[in-house]
């Protein structure tokens, strides 16, 4: 079954991205920080997060994506033995064609064991993270796709997730993420004006 994508307007229309239609805008029912946009699909336990973060000028381009991932892990309170970076690489111009080739772009795949909300049951999650370094705009732009690949039997996700296949087709998930990245476009750079 192929995905049906829908163009989503972010940050008041300043950015657009194609996201699968099955994902809903979480801001319609939950408060999300102003620097983030969040979409989720409860039935697959997948989510997409777009974040505008301060440019980390003290970190090299090659290490910046690892830095942002480590901040995510630390903020979530995940111990280092429950999180691993599987690989990371530079994105090609063809993978993010709406950005000049001179703009540094990276992608990372990691895996975490993490409990939802206040639960103790830990699910195994694949994290696909992309970083676009907008030095002139003083912004590190993150796009993250989270996908549960194994659910603990007592996790609250078990009751709502449909058809989670333990074998997990990682290449299909990676292709889904790359399709989103290919569509990602900044339409109005005044979004990044700092006072």
Curated annotation (Swiss-Prot):
<dbReference type="InterPro" id="IPR007681">
    <property type="entry name" value="Mog1"/>
</dbReference>
<comment type="function">
    <text>May regulate the intracellular trafficking of ran.</text>
</comment>
<dbReference type="GO" id="GO:0015031">
    <property type="term" value="P:protein transport"/>
</dbReference>
<dbReference type="GO" id="GO:0005085">
    <property type="term" value="F:guanyl-nucleotide exchange factor activity"/>
</dbReference>
<dbReference type="GO" id="GO:0005634">
    <property type="term" value="C:nucleus"/>
</dbReference>
<keyword id="KW-0653">Protein transport</keyword>
<keyword id="KW-0813">Transport</keyword>
<dbReference type="Pfam" id="PF04603">
    <property type="entry name" value="Mog1"/>
</dbReference>
<keyword id="KW-0344">Guanine-nucleotide releasing factor</keyword>
<dbReference type="GO" id="GO:0031267">
    <property type="term" value="F:small GTPase binding"/>
</dbReference>
<comment type="similarity">
    <text>Belongs to the MOG1 family.</text>
</comment>
<dbReference type="GO" id="GO:0005829">
    <property type="term" value="C:cytosol"/>
</dbReference>
<protein>
    <recommendedName>
        <fullName>Probable ran guanine nucleotide release factor</fullName>
    </recommendedName>
</protein>
<dbReference type="InterPro" id="IPR016123">
    <property type="entry name" value="Mog1/PsbP_a/b/a-sand"/>
</dbReference>
């Amino acid at each position: 079954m192929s995905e049906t994508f829908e163009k989503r307007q972010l940050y008041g229309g300043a950015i657009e991205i194609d996201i699968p239609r099955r994902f809903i805008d979480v801001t319609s029912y939950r408060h999300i920080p102003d620097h983030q946009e969040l979409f989720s699909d409860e039935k697959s336990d997948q989510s997409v997060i777009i974040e505008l973060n301060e440019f980390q000028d003290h970190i090299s381009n090659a290490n910046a994506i690892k830095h942002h991932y480590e901040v995510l892990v630390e903020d979530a309170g995940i111990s280092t033995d429950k999180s691993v970076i599987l690989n990371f690489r530079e994105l090609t111009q063809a993978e993010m064609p709406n950005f000049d080739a001179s703009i540094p772009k990276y992608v990372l795949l990691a895996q975490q064991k993490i409990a939802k909300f206040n639960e103790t049951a830990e699910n195994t999650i694949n994290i696909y993270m992309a970083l676009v370094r907008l030095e002139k705009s003083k912004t590190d732009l993150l796009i993250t796709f989270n996908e549960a690949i194994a659910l603990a039997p007592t996790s609250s996700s078990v009751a709502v997730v449909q058809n989670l296949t333990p074998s997990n087709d990682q290449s299909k998930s990676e292709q889904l993420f790359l399709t989103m990245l290919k569509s990602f476009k900044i339409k109005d750079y005044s979004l990044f004006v700092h006072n």
